[in-house]
Amino acid sequence: MEFKHIPVLLKETIDSLNIKQDGVYVDCTLGGGGHSLEILKRLSDKGKLIAIDQDISAINWSEERLKNFKNIIYVHDNFYNIQQILKELKIDKVDGIIMDLGVSSYQLDEGKRGFSYMKDAPLDMRMNRDSSLSAYEIVNQYNEEELCRIIRDYGEENFSRRISKFIVKAREESPISTTLQLVGIIKKAIPLKFQKEGHPAKRTFQAIRIEVNEELKILDKAVEDGVANLNTGGRIAIITFHSLEDRIIKSKFKMLENPCTCPADFPICICGKKPIVKIVNKKPIVPTEEEKSINPRSKSSKLRIAERI
């Protein structure tokens, strides 16, 4: 199957990196290779791109798509390990990092992966197929309190309690094994009058996917480690797709811009912690109306950029 994916905020993201022809860059989420391709076009033979993805399908597809470029290194891993990856490649510092945190169109459209609430598929949702924890285990083995917590915290779902109750009740009769089975349970749990805005299963599926792939735990560490490996003037550009991710990135960038831990009423800083980055855009960059009409999946995307100082 072709790895179809339209990269969002492509021009804005690439422009934000201020790419140097001989620079070293990291695409932490290779996907269909859209961002990587645009970076490679701007690099000379002396430049280098490290392309990371935990989905081997993305690696295989992009290796074919980008086969004419010789200055790209593919890494089948999670960008959580960015520091170790760079260490093993004997790369001390890089000039730019991209993280596109969205699920690719390929992963949504490929029925077998279980990411989509629009297609029937086994409950899976693993970005890395070698991982042991899948959506099936979460839905069928987590207790009601655990389910409620992840649906509430990761999905920001107002009906997390009802949904978790309905899931537990349904699985007492037989295991919940497919995506559309789960969708049916969620629809029963949410009162009809509250199902008018967006798909009723969207937030719960988001929550389960985040739990399966440990996305928020990965994100916090990866941003910190990524920034630590930037050259002075190097930039990190991060595209988020839901408010929870965006708040984490906004908060992380603020902390890196002002890491001082001194009490607010202290006249001078005595903790010695200096700013690590400067935030390039105080407000996130969002897609144009034109992009949203061409690619509806870009609607919720936001781009935040920070520069190492």
From Swiss-Prot:
It catalyses: cytidine(1402) in 16S rRNA + S-adenosyl-L-methionine = N(4)-methylcytidine(1402) in 16S rRNA + S-adenosyl-L-homocysteine + H(+). Its main location: cytoplasm. S-adenosyl-L-methionine binds at residues 33-35, 53, 79, 100, 107. The keyword Signal does not apply. Its EC number is 2.1.1.199. One of its GO terms (biological process) is rRNA base methylation. Coiled coil: none annotated. Keywords: Cytoplasm, Methyltransferase, rRNA processing, S-adenosyl-L-methionine, Transferase. The keyword S-adenosyl-L-methionine applies. It is an enzyme of class 2 (transferase). GO terms for cellular component: cytoplasm. GO terms for molecular function: rRNA (cytosine-N4-)-methyltransferase activity. It is found in: Cytoplasm. Specifically methylates the N4 position of cytidine in position 1402 (C1402) of 16S rRNA. Belongs to the methyltransferase superfamily. RsmH family. This is Ribosomal RNA small subunit methyltransferase H.
